[in-house]
Regions:
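Conserved catalytic core of sirtuin-type NAD+-dependent deacylases
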Residues: 1-229
């Protein structure tokens, strides 16, 4: 089977009802990013940070995978698929995808404030006083602004091995994820799917599809299945 790597961003989940923080109506409106998604914000006002992520975690139980999520899961019948997602939701998992690398962490995980390897699955609200086994406060298992991306090397390795790369639902503005495609082989076929794809300044060998994730995947699926054989 050929290696198919997906780099997914907030746009694919937006079609399930999860707001994106770079759009005008996004979750970050009314919030200073550094106040709710940085080590500085956590140190300054941990309760505010917990409230913010508790709200986002609750929202997960009100949304469902869309046809684009399901199409990517379906491709596992035809390719060795690896999904590298910038999203912290679990919609790829619920759609049926089996190999998912969460570059920026997961809403349904929390970790020790002191030890990033002490990670727990967490579906309820997280409160001050909820402690890890090392007696430190639990925090969202999210890669905040200013923090290193621990899975970046693994993501780069996957992109290097890709025969086909699909970039879907990302504005390619959040680094280092935005530069991942540059690690692809010169022979790798690359599709970029986004409603504003044509506005992106990308190499000419990247095929831009100026559509939403759902519409683009519906159109592209027959071709992808044909190319797999």
């Amino acid at each position: 089977m050929k290696n198919l790597v997906i780099l997914s961003g907030a746009g694919i989940s937006a079609e399930s009802g999860i707001k994106t923080f770079r759009d005008a109506d996004g979750l970050w409106e009314g919030h200073d990013i550094m106040e709710v998604a940085s080590p500085y914000g956590w140190k300054k006002n941990p309760q505010k940070v917990l409230d913010f992520y508790n709200q986002r975690r609750r929202q997960l139980f009100e949304v469902y995978p869309n046809k684009a999520h399901k199409a990517l899961a379906e491709l596992e019948k035809h390719y060795q698929v690896h999904i590298i997602t910038q999203n912290v939701d679990d919609l790829h998992e619920r759609a049926g995808s089996s190999r998912i690398l969460h570059l920026h962490g997961e809403l349904l995980s929390v970790r020790s404030e002191k030890d990033p390897n002490l990670v727990y699955r967490w579906e309820k609200d997280l409160n001050l006083g909820d402690l890890a086994k090392d007696k430190s406060q639990l925090r969202p298992d999210i890669v905040w602004f200013g923090e290193a991306v621990p899975l970046l090397k693994e993501a780069i390795s996957l992109v290097k091995q890709a025969h086909l790369l699909i970039i879907i639902g990302t504005s390619l503005q959040v680094y280092p994820a935005a530069s991942l495609y540059t690690h692809a082989s010169k022979d790798t076929l690359i599709y970029y799917i986004d409603p504003k794809a044509k506005n992106a300044r990308l190499p000419q060998n990247i095929q831009c599809i100026n559509e939403s994730a759902v519409h683009a995947m519906q159109d592209l699926m027959p071709k992808l299945i044909e190319m797999a054989s």
